[in-house]
């Protein structure tokens, strides 16, 4: 494949970005890289506080992949040191720090998931404890001298906490400095972060400049809205699509995205070019292409990315069978169990891994989201007799056949 022109590279890199600080610096860095043959160092940092990645995280990963495809060095930085502090960005109170063991476990989970997107042969995985744990007390104090409390209180989250009398710990003030120091240690040319990280990634530019390094270009990307179309995608809000979810789940959840949000997902998640996306939008607005077909194309693309083309086709067929034909999945999962007495329905749902807990099971029953052999379950205290088989459906897409042995 021919290398895109400089203009095409800039267009690709800026696609979906909120900030590019600065474009002139980016152009100069790309030109110098092309002339010298030395790839740019492009980093994005992830604190391993929530180990399961969802599509919201992949907005940054997709941008890293674009740089990777252009021949640059991608650094996937795992903030194992900063993860033990806890990023205060956007928080109304001090976050509970993770233990060393929790951070290490979560970091390993991250590493297994990111290579669903990034090429492992072209990715450097770094841990910021490598350099941060070696900083002396003198160096830490010197680092702290480069930022004033007044500037820190310019941050909306800190300002709100200060004005409302909520405590702010000194270590939280240190977080942007420590994150910024990562760029110094890695001599980064470009850093990518969410819009909520703007203050922190700009700190990297300041620290590089004060140490005689060329300041990194900062690219900020928007926070992807979740399935509710309102709040940012978040596991805690339950509005997320996890990249390790099964193919049927990813496909079905993408189809549930609102028409208004669909092209936002295309822009931030799809590999289609800007022109191809514009063509889809034009066809849809002209009435020659139904919105559902446009959405199905995105669902196939994302399902194939995290599974395979075959899995995406099977998920689409499964969806058609379940929703349009009123059937059940062809590859219906089974759960076999041997019991001597009736089992509480919420417990059965949890045991069969249809819900994460009995409390979630009770909530789903209250919401009318559980059916047994086609009949809606309405009693959360219901006991199931351990005889024969029962087909359980939870929500719109999840089925399991329970076989009592």
Swiss-Prot record:
Q: Which GO terms describe its molecular function?
A: ATP binding; RNA binding; tyrosine-tRNA ligase activity
Record's protein name: Tyrosine--tRNA ligase
Q: Which organism is it from?
A: Desulfotalea psychrophila (strain LSv54 / DSM 12343)
Q: Where along the sequence does the record place the motif called 'KMSKS' region?
A: 232-236
Instruction: Identify one Gene Ontology CC term for this UniProt entry.
Output: cytosol
Q: How does it assemble?
A: Homodimer.
One Pfam family, short name: tRNA-synt_1b
- What function does this protein fulfil? Catalyzes the attachment of tyrosine to tRNA(Tyr) in a two-step reaction: tyrosine is first activated by ATP to form Tyr-AMP and then transferred to the acceptor end of tRNA(Tyr).
Residue numbers covered by motif 'HIGH' region: 48-57
**Family classification:** Belongs to the class-I aminoacyl-tRNA synthetase family. TyrS type 2 subfamily.
